[in-house]
């Protein structure tokens, strides 16, 4: 039986699961390889010994830009065994982001995959890395040595010589930086453990389940998900890229019971299922074993919840988290359809959510304000002390910058971002509220609502949409505003400008809409 209080570090959890489930599968990949929990532990020990021979030890700052593979998980666990400070970097990041992260994190070593998907990561990082930074291409295999040479563990569960103790920073993640420079977010093993335990508890995963990782493992959700696997003892299919048809085929082969990653995955599986049934009308469900589709990272329109749930014939549970706190709330398989489609669930075990009004007082039930939180899964600090000072309220709670309210049933509803507010003639307007209604128009596939500078109003409301049917007559502003009026949207919130694009610009590991790019494009 797993006892959270006895596990203080990621490596302790690896050892716990290896003892409990040594010969049970932990990973299956898209190339037909499988490895057990015990095999991952043993491999990580050999790699840790190899890293140590290269000079990596407790407190060494190691950045890695590696694809989502079994070897990447092994490398990160090996670094955890050594007590290194890890900085994962999304594989799609290029010179601008990577250069900033390497310099800001003061990386001493950088692990890269060599040439991956036609791009030479080794050459890029060698151009960017400062003097004294060692670049280690690991495309042909991780360094290995005899684990007998590793330092013994002290009573606190960290390698001898590790700095500070179990509360030391061991992970530095960088926000996607879609609106500004990336922020360095410092986590400890303990904060990530708390998030992973919250995820495992909310979803009720067990050793009978088979999960999936098709999103970047370098995202903070990667180790969080692996922690949930280690806590509950379930295996997962791991893919180094996500293509819906290929992913669905691999999931069918292995009997995956839980899939997901973000709202974009819901839409991708919905579209793939429709194509699948068109090709094979008698084939049945896209993934017959699937019982849960879960994710977060972006709003989930209720109509997408309904359509994907019907098409895939499974429960859809959406959550809320961020780099600073990867697991805040999560829906559960036991919630009602109304709760799952209209909220982001209840706070997970250990998370304390409060809603603050602009004057700093606590909002009442159903009253909207800024979402603030405390909990064991909350990051330690930003690498920039000024950002840290600005991010916390006087009572020590973290200001998320998100707007929302708590319902009487304890579920959280997100209504927008503090910085995603359009100020029109002095009135604050939530872009998310309008987006949700714009998406209900039958001519609209996707929508983003932005504020544009306006001499008379301060800002005007602009809706940017992609057409559901590109061959159909284009949607007009008059047609859209009539639809929004019929949906009950007040006149002051109606869009004053409509733009139609082939696709919305997206970026970051969760494929979020780049609103700054849209504002720049459509500002007159």
Annotate each PLM feature.
Residues 93-99, 110-112, 259, 375, ...:
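AMP-binding/adenylate-forming catalytic core of the ANL superfamily
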Residues 193-210, 218-260, 267-268, 272-279:
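Conserved AMP-binding/adenylation subdomain of ANL enzymes
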Residues 346-350, 361-391, 429:
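Conserved ATP/PPi-binding loop(s) of AMP-dependent carboxylate-activating enzymes
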Residues 5-7, 22-23, 136-138, 150-174, ...:
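Conserved pre-ATP/AMP-binding loop-to-beta segment of ANL
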Residues 54, 84-148:
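Structural core segment of the AMP-binding/adenylate-forming
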Residues 340, 352-372, 408-409, 470-477, ...:
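Conserved beta-loop-beta connector loops within the AMP-binding
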Residues 6-7, 23-69, 73-77, 94-99, ...:
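Conserved AMP-binding/adenylate-forming core of the ANL superfamily
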Residues 231, 256-261, 270-339, 352, ...:
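Gly/Ser/Thr-rich phosphate-binding loop
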């Amino acid at each position: 039986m797993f006892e959270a209080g006895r596990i203080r570090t990621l490596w302790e959890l690896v050892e716990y699961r290896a003892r409990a489930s040594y010969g049970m599968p932990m990973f299956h990949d898209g190339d037909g390889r499988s490895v057990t929990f015990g095999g991952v532990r043993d491999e990580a020990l050999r790699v840790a010994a190899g890293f140590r021979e290269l000079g990596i030890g407790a407190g060494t700052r190691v950045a890695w830009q590696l694809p989502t593979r079994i070897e990447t998980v092994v490398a990160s666990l090996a670094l955890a065994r050594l007590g290194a400070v890890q900085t994962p970097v999304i594989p799609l990041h290029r010179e601008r982001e990577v250069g900033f992260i390497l310099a800001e994190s003061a990386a001493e070593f950088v692990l890269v995959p060599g040439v991956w998907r036609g791009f030479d990561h080794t050459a890029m990082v060698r151009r960017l890395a400062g003097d004294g930074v060692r670049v280690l291409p690991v495309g042909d295999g991780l360094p290995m040595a005899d684990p007998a040479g590793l330092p013994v563990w002290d009573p606190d569960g960290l390698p001898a010589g590790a700095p500070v103790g179990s509360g030391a920073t061991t992970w530095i993640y960088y926000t996607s930086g879609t609106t500004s420079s990336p922020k360095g977010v410092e986590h400890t093993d303990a904060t990530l453990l708390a998030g992973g335990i919250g995820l495992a508890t909310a979803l009720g995963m067990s050793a009978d389940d088979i999960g999936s990782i098709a999103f970047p493992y370098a995202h903070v959700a990667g180790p969080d998900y692996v922690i949930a696997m280690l806590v509950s003892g379930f295996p997962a299919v791991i893919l180094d890229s996500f293509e819906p048809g290929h992913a669905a085929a691999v999931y069918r082969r292995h009997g995956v019971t839980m899939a997901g990653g973000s709202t974009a995955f819901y839409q991708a599986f919905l579209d793939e299922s429709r194509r699948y049934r068109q090709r094979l009308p008698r084939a049945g469900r896209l993934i017959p074993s699937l019982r849960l589709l879960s994710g977060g990272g972006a709003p989930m329109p209720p109509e997408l919840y309904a359509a994907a749930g019907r098409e895939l014939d499974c429960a859809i549970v959406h959550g809320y988290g961020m780099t600073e706190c990867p697991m805040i709330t999560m829906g559960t398989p036991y919630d009602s359809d109304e709760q799952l489609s209209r909220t982001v669930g209840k706070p997970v075990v250990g998370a304390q959510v409060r809603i603050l009004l602009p004057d700093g007082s606590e909002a009442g039930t159903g009253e909207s304000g800024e979402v603030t939180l405390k909990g064991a899964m909350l990051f330690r600090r930003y690498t920039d002390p000024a950002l840290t000072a600005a991010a916390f309220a006087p009572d020590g709670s973290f200001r998320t910058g998100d707007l929302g309210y708590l319902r009487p049933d304890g579920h959280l509803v997100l209504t927008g971002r503090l910085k995603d507010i359009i100020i029109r003639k002095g009135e604050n307007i939530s872009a998310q509220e309008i987006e949700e209604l714009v998406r209900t128009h039958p001519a609209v596939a996707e929508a983003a609502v932005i504020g544009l500078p306006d001499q008379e109003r301060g800002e005007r409301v602009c809706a940017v949409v992609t057409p559901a049917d590109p061959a159909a007559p284009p949607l007009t502003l008059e047609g859209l505003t009539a639809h929004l009026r019929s949906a009950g949207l007040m006149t002051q919130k109606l869009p004053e400008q409509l733009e139609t694009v082939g696709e919305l610009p997206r970026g970051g590991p969760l494929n979020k809409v780049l609103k700054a790019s849209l504002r720049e494009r459509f500002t007159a």
